[in-house]
Amino acid sequence: MRRMSSVGLIHIAAHGNERTGEITLSPNPGWSSKFPQRNDYVLKMSDVQAANLRARLVVLSCCHSGRGRVFKGEGVVGIARAFLAAGARSVLVALWTIDDKATMVFMKSFYQHLKEGKTASAAIHQSMKSLRESEEFSKSWYWAPFQLIGDDVKIEFEADDDVKE
């Protein structure tokens, strides 16, 4: 979490909890017990809210990362909202289980469009369109789970940043 406080773009590819949207990370190698405890590998809302983020965009490439508890008058309160509360301007989430291969294709396209100067929403739109028009990923199950929450941001990349094939 300390490292996240100083970057403009955060990308987390991990597992998301179907019910809560909490994110399961690799356990910290410095855990104190013989077996990792839940706190060693689950990224909770309270962990995120305690951070002081300056990220313009957080990408949660995790199943169910748009999930949370629904509160009357508040809407969905989950990990994505915690990132916004901690200072992120925008969060890209998945609303349901995402296919690994389709997500890889989506993310490559998404980052390429961001690098070309498109806004996050335009990059999402173009990436969804590309999947939708493909033979392999034309079903909505593959291209429709991604949702942007927050501001429609642009990301400035360094000249030597590259989207790997």
Language-model segments: which ranges?
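Catalytic cores of enzymes
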Residues: M1-E165
